[in-house]
Every structure is written in structure tokens, then in C-alpha cells.
Curated annotation (Swiss-Prot):
This is Acetyl-coenzyme A carboxylase carboxyl transferase subunit beta. The keyword Iron does not apply. GO terms for biological process: fatty acid biosynthetic process; malonyl-CoA biosynthetic process. One of its GO terms (cellular component) is acetate CoA-transferase complex. Binds 1 zinc ion per subunit. Acetyl-CoA carboxylase is a heterohexamer composed of biotin carboxyl carrier protein (AccB), biotin carboxylase (AccC) and two subunits each of ACCase subunit alpha (AccA) and ACCase subunit beta (AccD). Its cofactor is Zn(2+). Component of the acetyl coenzyme A carboxylase (ACC) complex. Biotin carboxylase (BC) catalyzes the carboxylation of biotin on its carrier protein (BCCP) and then the CO(2) group is transferred by the transcarboxylase to acetyl-CoA to form malonyl-CoA. It comes from the Bacteria.
């Protein structure tokens, strides 16, 4: 007689009950890798409560955070890019524009208009990275230029929040021309004695950094923002050297005198208000 008798009936594994979790309930911080309740991040102005990492936000979210409630009047909302070169890489440029409009709900990578910060009138232009990486084409350059010209007309400060991968390659020389165009407009603002405050957020790179983003009377940045011309990976491959820790981050730039200050998102409005009072002698 066998000591152990095999059961004839097969062993059926107990099915585990899978709980379906709705998408977007939790978010992973790319800096500290913590899994955090999404609403907790939103309550903290899209800043990680564990490590202070500043998540990217949309242009409209930033406007709501910085400007007085109900004060913003948008200009040139219907302005759209045109595929004048009939550019095509893996995809036609006109199709990329249509896809970006559908994804972001915007007609291009910048929103600009008039508003107020603690009752101080300002003209503000804000990049939205979700529209083709915040790249600068003819529409972006025109909007920035119009914002500067409106500040001249209103005799008030101009603020630009940058978040861009640089010039838009699909527009070739027309996108590069915007660097000179925006810089020339800011030169006229400077001659008029009106303040221009540049706020660089993650990331601010390429032709945007090489033009108006670095021309502020005060150059501010959010914590850990990537700021530079070429990206760190491209630089390492070119010079074949390992870059220093934190290279091109806002803290590194502040340490080396490239920017004036780093301001956390919850403190941004108060700091801007302070700067505006100093500049406008109020």
C-alpha cells in the first residue's frame, strides 16, 4: 500500500480577484520615484510633496496660478501655424499641427494676453510644452513679439514663462528668424525703460534659451529646471566627457551666475509681485 495516494481530482488554483484601478489616480515622481496620490500633487500646485520636484503644467494652469483671478484677457487665440514649406519628415507638418491642436486644445505653443498680479497690470506670454514640445515657430515668435509691443503700448511690465525644446525644425529659417525678431522687440522695451521678467521652467532649451529667455532684466527659474542650448546627452556625445552632476539644471546655473534666482511655484506670484513693485516704484 502506497504511503501517499495521488488525488484523482486536479488541483484548481483559486482565481485572484483583480481590482481595476482607474487611470490617473496615482502618479510616479520622476525624481524620487515615489508613487503619490494624484490629487495630493494637484493640491500642492503640481509639486511633489516628497522631494519638491516641479511637474510640468499647462499654460492655462500657470496663468491661473500667477495672475489675479478673472484678470486675464487672451489675445490672438486663433492664430495658427501654416505649412508654407510643405515640410515632411516621418509625417507631414500640417498633420503634426492638427495632432498637436487636438492633443493640447491650443492652436500653438504660446498663450499671451493682458492681466494683473496683485492689481499690477502686466502683459504675459506662457509656453505650453504639450504643443510640439513648446517649439518656436513663426506663430510663437509673432505672439512673443506682440506681447512685448503690447507692454510698450500699455507702459507696463512684460513676463514670459518659457518651456520649450527650441526652434521648430519644420519651419526651417523662418523659425530661426524668430530669435532675432523677439530679441529686437525686447531691445525696444529696454529702451523705453520697461521691465521684462523671464521665468524659465522645465525644460527651456535651444533657440528659446539663445534668445528672449535669457534677456530678462530678471532671469528666474523653477527648481531643477533643465536650461541650456544643446541637451546634456548631445554635449556628452560631442565632447566625449562626462558632465558634472546637475549640469544645466537651474541650481547649477544659479551657482555659476547664469540666472538671478530660483523660485518655487507656490512662492512665484508673491515674488513676481515684489519684483513688479520695485521696478514700477509702487
Amino acid at each position: 500500500m502506497a504511503w501517499f495516494k495521488k488525488s484523482k481530482a486536479p488541483i484548481v488554483p483559486v482565481e485572484s480577484k483583480k481590482v481595476k484601478m482607474p487611470e490617473g489616480v496615482w502618479r510616479k515622481c520622476p525624481h524620487c520615484n515615489e508613487i503619490i496620490y494624484a490629487k495630493e500633487i494637484e493640491r500642492n500646485l503640481n509639486v511633489c510633496p516628497k522631494c519638491d520636484y516641479h511637474f510640468r503644467i499647462s499654460a492655462r494652469e500657470r496663468i491661473a496660478l500667477v495672475l489675479d483671478e478673472g484678470s486675464f484677457v487672451e489675445r490672438d487665440a486663433g492664430m495658427k501655424s501654416v505649412d508654407f514649406l510643405e515640410f515632411k519628415d516621418g509625417k507631414r507638418y500640417r498633420d503634426r499641427i492638427s495632432a498637436a491642436i487636438k492633443k493640447s486644445g491650443l492652436n500653438d505653443a504660446v498663450i499671451w494676453g493682458e492681466g494683473a498680479i496683485e492689481a499690477q497690470p502686466v502683459v504675459v506670454a506662457v509656453f505650453d510644452f504639450s504643443f510640439m514640445g513648446g517649439s518656436m515657430g513663426s506663430v510663437v515668435g509673432e505672439k512673443i513679439t506682440r506681447a512685448v509691443e503690447k507692454a510698450l503700448e500699455n507702459r507696463c511690465p512684460c513676463l514670459v514663462f518659457s518651456s520649450s525644446g527650441g526652434a521648430r525644425m519644420q519651419e526651417s529659417i523662418m523659425s530661426l528668424m524668430q530669435m532675432a525678431k523677439t530679441s529686437a522687440a525686447l531691445s525696444r522695451l529696454k529702451e523705453a525703460g520697461l521691465p521684462y521678467i523671464s521665468i524659465m521652467t522645465d525644460p527651456t532649451t535651444g533657440g528659446v534659451t539663445a534668445s528672449f529667455a535669457m534677456l530678462g532684466d530678471v532671469n528666474m527659474a523653477e527648481p531643477r529646471a533643465l536650461i541650456g542650448f544643446a541637451g546634456p546627452r548631445v554635449i556628452e556625445q560631442t565632447i566625449r566627457q562626462k558632465l558634472p552632476e546637475g549640469f544645466q539644471r537651474s541650481e547649477y546655473l544659479l551657482e555659476h551666475g547664469m540666472i538671478d534666482m530660483i523660485v518655487r511655484r507656490p512662492e512665484m506670484k508673491a515674488r513676481l509681485s515684489q519684483m513688479l513693485r520695485i521696478f514700477m516704484k509702487q
